[in-house]
Swiss-Prot record:
GO BP annotation list: positive regulation of programmed cell death; programmed cell death; synaptic vesicle lumen acidification
GO cellular component, as recorded: presynapse; vacuolar proton-transporting V-type ATPase, V1 domain
Gene of this entry: vha-10
Organism from which the protein derives: Caenorhabditis briggsae
Chain segments carrying region Disordered: 23-45
GO molecular function, one term: proton-transporting ATPase activity, rotational mechanism
Quaternary structure annotation from Swiss-Prot or TrEMBL: V-ATPase is a heteromultimeric enzyme made up of two complexes: the ATP-hydrolytic V1 complex and the proton translocation V0 complex. The V1 complex consists of three catalytic AB heterodimers that form a heterohexamer, three peripheral stalks each consisting of EG heterodimers, one central rotor including subunits D and F, and the regulatory subunits C and H. The proton translocation complex V0 consists of the proton transport subunit a, a ring of proteolipid subunits c9c'', rotary subunit d, subunits e and f, and the accessory subunits vah-19/Ac45 and vah-20/PRR.
Pfam families with a match to the protein in the record: V-ATPase_G
UniProt entry keywords in alphabetical sequence: Hydrogen ion transport, Ion transport, Transport
NCBIfam families: V_ATP_synt_G
Protein name in UniProt: Probable V-type proton ATPase subunit G
Length: 126
């Protein structure tokens, strides 16, 4: 009987040690998983920074800096405004003369609807 109790005790102790080893293995696995996740995150962040740097280099090479774009837009806008001012200056007198002609030179005429009505009325009267 004592040997059975001792055998049971040994089995319980072995089961306890096995459970501890399983728990330790789970903890190590969890720790390795966390570490792998952190390493992967660091690698992703490094790759992201690298691609961002490449994009900035590409952008600067082909598009120029933001200030360059602003100054180019400003120059283009000023050129367009100056062109419009020159167009106004060169056509101003002709527009004034044309407006005065349209306002002052009145040619009385019958409205085209009235003319059409007279033509239609004349067809039915005949």
């Amino acid at each position: 009987m004592a040997s059975q109790t001792q055998g049971i005790q040994q089995l319980l102790a072995a089961e306890k040690r096995a459970a501890e080893k399983i728990n330790e293995a789970r903890k190590r696995k969890l720790q390795r998983t966390k570490q792998a996740k952190q390493e992967a995150q660091a690698e992703v962040e490094k790759y992201k920074q690298q691609r961002e740097q490449e994009f900035k280099g590409f952008e600067q090479q082909y598009l120029g800096t933001k200030e360059d774009i602003e100054s180019k837009i400003r120059r283009d806008t000023e050129d367009q405004i100056n062109g419009m001012k020159q167009s106004v200056a060169s056509n101003k007198q002709a527009v004034i003369v044309r407006l005065l002609q349209l306002v002052c030179d009145i040619k009385p005429e019958l409205h085209h609807n009235l003319t059409l009505q007279k033509k239609l009325h004349g067809q039915f009267a005949a």
